[in-house]
Amino acid sequence: PLARKKMRSPLTSAESFQPQPAVARSDYHHILMVLQGMGIMLERAWNSFVNMHEEDLRHIFLAALNTHFVEQASGETFNSEGKTDILIKHENGGIVFVAECKVWTGPMSLCDAIDQVLSYLTWRESKAAIILFNRDRQIATVLNAVPKTVAEHPQWKRTEQSLLDLPSTFLYTIKHPSDENIEVSVSILVFNLPFRK
């Protein structure tokens, strides 16, 4: 037999309201610096990584992030509408950053990556990144295509000055798909990791 449940009044907290965690611009910059440093290391030793796929490369970036954010970065973690490649949680459990790793196959692959990363954000999350790997094209072609492709995306709001000092990094303000008044910072970091020829 099923037991009847008694409705209980919710317990009220004696503590004051704690707002949702948000990433300070300096922390977002730190996350991007870790990703950039790891990506540059991969480029310098590209021959060691030529046969790795997105998922394998993601694990390398996760390892680097977890040296800075102990047990806060995870991979293939469910948030909102799916599993994001990289997710960083605040110590209180709130999500503060998500990222997707993608191989560039043309402008459409970047548009799809933007849609994908946005689908993993609730209205509370405002910092994201796309780690874009160039595997078989001239890097200048990819770098020239990124700004044009993003500016044509329907959620694009404006182009910002990148927080990083490399011509292979970009920062955009994107409209959140659930509310165009909510702004999301999306950084795109491009790394050249060719396949062995």
Predicted regions and their residues:
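The feature marks a conserved, polyanion-engaging helical scaffold used by nucleic-acid processing enzymes
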Residues: 1-66, 70
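Short, well-structured alpha-helical interface segments that form or flank functional binding sites
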Residues: 30, 52, 56, 60, ...
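Catalytic cores of nucleic-acid endonucleases
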Residues: 103-154
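Domain-level recognition of nuclease-like catalytic cores that cleave nucleotide substrates
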Residues: 135-197
